[in-house]
C-alpha cells in the first residue's frame, strides 16, 4: 500500500505539474510563437488510431468511413483520485462546451469539426481541445491528427491527401514533437504512409514510437514477422515499439466496456503463444502504452524546459523590439494628441536637417546622401574635363574654313577672334543639357532620401504621410524649376566670352610653356624628325595658335561651370528644398482640426500592434508560469 501511495505522490508532485505546465502554455497560445513538447498521433486510415485513443481516454471519439478526424484534436487527460466524478470539456475558437458524461464527447467533437471545417469532408488546421478528467485515464496529453488517405472519395477535395500530409507535417517535423505512429500488425510495415512520413522528418528514429494494433488479425505463421518488428529488426526506431489490442467493431456492437476490453486484451497477450513474451517485457497492452507515453512525455518536457525558457525570452525580446519600432501609442485626449503630433513633426524636421548637413545615420554598407551627391559632382567635373580635351570635328572644320576661305591680310599665326568666339560658344552650349540631366538625377536622389525619412517617421499614419508626400512633390517641382532656370541662365551668360586679362594671360603662358617643353623633348628623342617639322607652314602656325587659345579659355570655363553648377544644385535642391519642407511641416500644425485625421493609423499597423501586444502578454504569462514551475 505504501508503494502505491508513493507512486501516487510521485505522479502528483512530478508528472502532473510538467504536463499541466505545457497544457497551460498551449492554452495561452504560446504555440503560435514557438513549438511546445508534444506527442502527435498519426496513422493511415483504418490503422486503429481512433481505437488506441479511445482506449487511452476512455471516451468514444468520432468513427466511421473516410476522414473522421478533420481537425487536430488536443486530447488532455487528467487522472483523478478514485471516487471523483468524470468531467470533460470541448473547446474551439471562443466556444467551451462542458460535458458531464463520456457519451457526449463524440457529438461535441463532431459539432466542433463542422463549425471549424464546415459540414462535409474538408479539413482545417485549427485545434479542437478535449479535456477529460477521470480516475480511469493516465496523466497525458496527445495531439490526434487526421488519418492519412491516398485517394479522394465522394465529395472530398481532389487534393485531400496532399492537404492532410501538409497538416501532419507541420506537427511531426518539429523537433519538440514525439511522433506516435499507429500501424496495423497485419500489414507490411514498409508500405505504411505514416511510418514513411515519420522517417522523412526523423531519419534516425530518435523521437518516433511505433504502436502496432490488431494483433488478433495477424495471419497464422506471420507472428514471427510481428515479433521481428517489435524487436526493432525490421524498421528500427530508437524509442522502439508497443503493441495493443483494442476493441474491434464486434466488441463495440456488443457494447463491450473499456474495462472489459482491457481484461480481454490482458488475457489475449497472456495466453498468446508468440506475443506473451511482449507482455512480460512491458511492451504490450494499453495500460503499458499509457504508462510508457506518460514517462516519455514527462521526460521530454523536462529536457525541453531550459531551451523552452530561452526561446520564450528570445521571442519576448524580439516582439518588444518590433513593437518599439512602431513608436508610442497615440494619446486619447485632443491636447495630448496635438503634443504628440508636434513631437513627431519636430523629430522629422530634425532628421531632414541632419540629412542636409550630412549628419544622418546610415546603415552599414550604405553611404550618406552628401557622399552620393559629391560623387555626382566629381563625375560632372570629369565629364567637362574629358569633353574639352577632345578635339571636336567642328573645331577642326572652323580652323580649316578660316585658313582656306576667310583668311585675309593676317600674317601667319594670328587668330581670327570671331572664329575663336564661335567655337567657344558652341562647345560650352553643348554642356547645358548634361548639366540639366545631372540636376534631375540629383533631384530624384534627394527626393528619394526625403521620402524615405518621411516613410520611416510617418509610415504608420497614412493621412499625414500622403499629405506630406504630396507637399514634398510640389516643393520638388518648384525647386527643380528654379534650379533649371538658373542653370540655363548661367549657360546664357557663358555665351559671353570673357576672362580677366591677367588670369587669361597666365593660363595661356602656362599652356605655351608646356607645349614648348614637349617640343624640346621630341627634339632630344628624334632630332632629325624635329628638324623637318620645325619649318612650320603658315597653316600650322594658325592652327597651333588657335588650339592654345582654346585650351586656355577651356580651363577657365571648366573652373566656372564645374563649380557653379553644383553650387546651384546644392542651394536649390538640398538646402532650400529641405528648408521648405521644414516650413511646410510646421504649417500643417496650424490646422488643429486635422490633428486626429493626421494621426489615424493604417489598419494593418493597428492590427500589427495589437498582435504584438497580445503576443507579449501571453509570453509574459508564459515566463511567469515557467518561473513559478522552477521555484
UniProtKB/Swiss-Prot annotation:
Region (Stalk): 333-601
Inducing stimuli: By type I and type III interferons.
Domain Dynamin-type G, chain residue ranges per copy: 33-306
Region Middle domain, residue ranges: 332-499
Region (G1 motif): 43-50
Post-translational modification: ISGylated.
Pfam families noted in UniProt: Dynamin_M (PF01031), Dynamin_N (PF00350), GED (PF02212)
Annotated compartments: Cytoplasm; Nucleus; Endoplasmic reticulum membrane; Cytoplasm, Perinuclear region
Stretch list, region G2 motif: 68-70
Keyword GTP-binding annotated: yes
Gene Ontology cellular-component annotations: endoplasmic reticulum membrane; nucleus; perinuclear region of cytoplasm
CDD domains: DLP_1 (cd08771)
Domain of life, source organism: Eukaryota
Membrane topology field: Peripheral membrane protein
Positions of the UniProt region annotated as G5 motif: 245-248
Keywords from the UniProt entry: Antiviral defense, Cytoplasm, Endoplasmic reticulum, GTP-binding, Immunity, Innate immunity, Membrane, Nucleotide-binding, Nucleus, Ubl conjugation
Region (G3 motif): 144-147
Region annotation (Critical for lipid-binding) ranges: 520-522
Residues bound to GTP: 43-50, 144-148, 213-216
Region (Bundle signaling element (BSE)): 307-332
Biological-process GO terms, alphabetical: defense response to virus; innate immune response; response to virus
GO molecular function, one term: GTPase activity
Comment block on domains: The C-terminal GTPase effector domain (GED) is involved in oligomerization and viral target recognition.
Family membership: Belongs to the TRAFAC class dynamin-like GTPase superfamily. Dynamin/Fzo/YdjA family.
Description of how the protein assembles with itself and partners: Homooligomer. Oligomerizes into multimeric filamentous or ring-like structures by virtue of its stalk domain. Oligomerization is critical for GTPase activity, protein stability, and recognition of viral target structures. Interacts with TRPC1, TRPC3, TRPC4, TRPC5, TRPC6 and TRPC7. Interacts with HSPA5. Interacts with TUBB/TUBB5. Interacts with DDX39A and DDX39B.
Protein name, UniProt field: Interferon-induced GTP-binding protein Mx1
Gene from which this protein is expressed: Mx1
